[in-house]
């Protein structure tokens, strides 16, 4: 791993955590990563998945994420998009692999742009992973295997349920096999879902050139409606969250108006399309 990545991981803690909490997380992370890097994975699957990672405020996670994805047998290529023009992402990487595609964006990009990247690569299956979430290759394969068995919906490991009684979302639905209304942070989907995503984007008028296209508040919601049935999250065992996933200087969900925007969008999406349970 690049030295600068490990130094930043040690020195950059979440504003919500104390230093002792941060050091305990580091110990858990390194134990988990060692096991994930060494585990054996069944390779009797086709390599037909395009995986995409966006990096903006957490470049120290890039090498670990790329390594985990390249060790996942289903993954044909990994596209790493550096969405922060102030960062030279190659300074944070030592991996050299023909399956790794690195894109340095000329301007800062938002989350919806990853779907534009996906559209450039003809592939039956796609995997989007946020840069604050670590899953082992076997866990990624579990989700991709579920997608292969059921292509009617988007698959993931964490999501949200909408509660009509309170007109709000229940968050952090994870560690169980269950349908959700919105899947978050990791998304396994098909080329058909990608086309439907852009159809819904057009209906919402959220496409390139709109104000919403440059906001990172909504693409997970629209993608969740791109199937015919509700998204499904899976029980895959212990995975690791980066503590900076809740850091107010980075995390989009900490922005003012985030939740109100998403509730309003959920109502618009349910008016446009109903999903089977």
Which functions belong to the PLM regions below?
Residues 67-76:
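Short, acidic, metal-binding catalytic loop of nucleotide-sugar glycosyltransferases
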Residues 84-121:
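Active-site-proximal specificity loops/subdomain of glycosyltransferases
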Residues 2-34, 42-46, 60-65, 191, ...:
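C-terminal catalytic/acceptor-binding lobe
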Residues 129:
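Catalytic metal- and UDP-sugar-binding loop of GT-A-like glycosyltransferases, i.e.
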Residues 118, 134-208:
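Conserved catalytic core of nucleotide-sugar-dependent glycosyltransferases
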Residues 79-82:
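Short internal beta-strands
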Residues 53-63, 84:
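Active-site beta-to-alpha loop of glycosyltransferases that engages the nucleotide-sugar donor
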Residues 126:
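Short aromatic/hydrophobic "clamp" motif used to bind/position activated sugar donors
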């Amino acid at each position: 791993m690049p030295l600068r990545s490990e130094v930043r991981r040690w020195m950059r803690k979440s504003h919500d955590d104390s230093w002792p909490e941060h050091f305990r997380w580091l110990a858990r992370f390194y134990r988990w990563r060692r096991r994930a890097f060494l585990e054996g994975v069944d390779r009797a699957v086709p390599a037909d998945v395009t995986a995409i990672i966006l990096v903006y405020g957490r470049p120290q996670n890039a090498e670990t994420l790329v390594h985990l994805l390249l060790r996942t047998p289903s993954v044909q290529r990994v596209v790493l998009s550096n969405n922060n023009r102030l960062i030279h992402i190659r300074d944070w990487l030592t991996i050299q692999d023909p399956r790794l595609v690195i894109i340095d964006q000329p301007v800062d990009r938002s989350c919806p742009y990853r779907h534009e990247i996906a559209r450039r690569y003809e592939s039956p299956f796609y995997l989007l992973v946020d840069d604050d979430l670590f899953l082992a290759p076997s866990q990624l394969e579990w989700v991709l295997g579920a997608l292969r068995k059921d292509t009617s919906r988007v698959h993931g490991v964490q999501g949200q349920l909408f509660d009509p009684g309170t007109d709000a979302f229940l968050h952090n639905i994870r560690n169980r096999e269950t349908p959700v209304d919105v899947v978050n942070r990791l998304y396994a989907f098909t080329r058909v879902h990608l086309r439907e995503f852009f159809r819904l984007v057009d209906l919402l008028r959220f496409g390139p050139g709109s104000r919403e296209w440059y906001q990172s508040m909504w693409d997970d919601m629209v993608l969740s409606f791109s199937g015919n049935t509700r998204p499904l999250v899976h029980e895959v065992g212990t995975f690791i969250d980066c503590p900076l996933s809740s850091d107010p200087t980075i995390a989009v969900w900490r922005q003012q108006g985030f939740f109100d925007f998403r509730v309003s969008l959920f109502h618009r999406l349910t008016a446009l399309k109903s999903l089977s349970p």
